[in-house]
A protein has these predicted regions:
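Charge-rich amphipathic alpha-helical interaction elements
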Residues: 1-145
Length: 145
């Protein structure tokens, strides 16, 4: 199963709706909703950790490459005529490196997903109060409040 932000948004679009005619069922459904989105949160969190480690590995690999310290075979496949020694220049090359920036973008994407899932989990935690308020409002409207 491929998890992306759009899929999570579509799931939440369906799950966020509260059926006013079945508030008791909606109330009982809160724990399973929480479990569903908390599992997604944990999965994305671990994927982010993995991507963070990949970024560190790629950064080290690219640092070695740009400084001329990689295995000679690497330069046969992908020649790089310079040996960068200056720290500022090295940082510029690392910032512009496609492999490294792709991994950084992946981490940023995971961060966006995590923020979205955190907001969903907060809404789910408050759902009990929303349902309670809806019930009290119905009682009030029917003259029982």
């Amino acid at each position: 199963m491929s998890i992306d932000l759009e899929a999570i948004q579509e799931m939440w679009e369906k799950d966020s709706k509260i059926d006013r005619d079945n508030l008791h069922e909606e109330s009982l459904n809160i724990p399973s909703l929480h479990a569903k989105y908390f599992e997604l949160y944990n999965t994305i969190f671990l994927l982010r950790k993995k991507a963070e480690q990949q970024r560190k590995n790629i950064r080290h690999e690219r640092y070695e490459y740009f400084s001329g310290k990689s295995d000679p075979e690497v330069y046969v496949e992908n020649p790089f005529p310079k040996k960068i020694r200056d720290k500022d220049t090295m940082q510029k090359y690392l910032d512009a490196d496609e492999k490294l920036s792709n991994t950084s973008l992946k981490i940023d994407y995971y961060d966006t997903m995590l923020v979205y899932l955190e907001s969903i989990l907060k809404v789910i935690q408050n759902r009990t109060y929303q349902i309670k308020n809806a019930i009290e409002f119905m009682r009030f409207n029917s003259g029982l409040g």
